[in-house]
Amino acid sequence: MILVKDRTGSKNGTADSTLVGVFDSKRPLYRIVKWLILHIFPPVFRLLYGFRVVGRIPEEKMQNGCISVCNHVHKLDCVMLACVFQDYTMQFLSLESNLHILVAGAIVRLMGGIGLPAKLDGWRPVLKRIKQGLDEGQMLQIYPEGELIDGCRTLRAFQPGAFQITCWFRKPMIPCLLRFYPRFSKSGRRKRDGMELVILEPVDIPTDKKGKRAATELETQIRCQMEAARLAVGREGA
């Protein structure tokens, strides 16, 4: 997903793609959809999941473009991220099939979803769009697990592409984690588990390694942070 500082009304914030149509944060439809998302979904998420945020947005790392990763555990996790990073325009690099999920997929497409190409030659427009966004100070969000598994409590195997792309463009990476936490009523009765987004410390690209070795080291650092945060559920909150 690309997270970018919302530059509506300026020359920035636009990234073209032949894969999912043209994304333009200045177009009325995008602005209407974003307004609806930010005014409707936060209270719904709080009511259904007790949705909350742990950590802080590292704005100092987002000024010149960066890349974030998050586990993929809910059909509307992209909307949850959009609500948390509400001062930013968001674009999502995701499996093409995820962009066609009923309702959720339509929202992602309208918000700037980028479908992973099925063929190698399809990467050219994708990388062009990513570079344009990063050059404008945007933030690319990728789901390294690839497949969406609703309600998954474990951290699944990562695909290397997210970390290779980060090393290619030499941008810092911001790991995020969606996790479930126990909730109780005032009387002490167990309620449906809540959801929280944990924003972890940004990780810079290794300077002493290049290529696949740099990507592997970056993946190891990111996974360690995310796994530690997953196991820390219940010991921290916002």
What annotation goes with each model-predicted range?
Residues 43-49, 68-70, 116-121, 151-153:
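Short, flexible loop segments at the rims of nucleotide/cofactor-binding pockets, characterized by
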Residues 32, 36, 121-122, 214:
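Soluble or luminal CAZymes and related metallo-dependent hydrolases
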Residues 30-31, 93-94, 119-120, 127, ...:
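A generic secondary-structure micro-motif detector
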Residues 60-120:
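Catalytic core of membrane glycerolipid acyltransferases/transacylases, capturing the structured
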Residues 57-61, 131-132:
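Short amphipathic alpha-helix with an adjacent loop that forms part of the alpha/beta core around
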Residues 2-25, 124-238:
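Non-catalytic C-terminal accessory region of glycerolipid acyltransferases
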Residues 2-57, 87, 102-111:
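A transmembrane-helix-recognition feature enriched in membrane-embedded lipid enzymes
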